[in-house]
């Protein structure tokens, strides 16, 4: 995964539809929830109140029967020109499990949305004695396969 460095990132405020995420890798050798190339759920990310290298974010999952949501508790963005990497910390509810996650989204901003998007998710804390969601400290990598995460008007 490319981390776009720099202290002059583009303004990424807006709503983006991540609707073509494909699984690439997991750090957990026992994680069999996905195999390479499997599609992931669709997400809508909302970035707002960007001030320099700080930005706020929320997300929700758009999948029938799944009501995952998260509220950002802090985000830092790096990059320069149109390329950026945003480091997000969320309080989330995933498949009914309260948890905290850290997400990295890296890509290039265009007038249509975000191209070359890579999405990394790790859970840092969870209330999940049944291990319904991924293990704490492991991570999964997804790519927005052969398309742009389109900018949206409604969250």
Describe each region flagged by the PLM:
Residues 15-26, 58-62, 85-93, 102, ...:
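Generic short beta-strand segments
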Residues 36-42:
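Short coil-to-beta strand junction motifs in C2/discoidin
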Residues 97-155:
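Glycine-rich, aromatic-bearing surface loops/beta-hairpins
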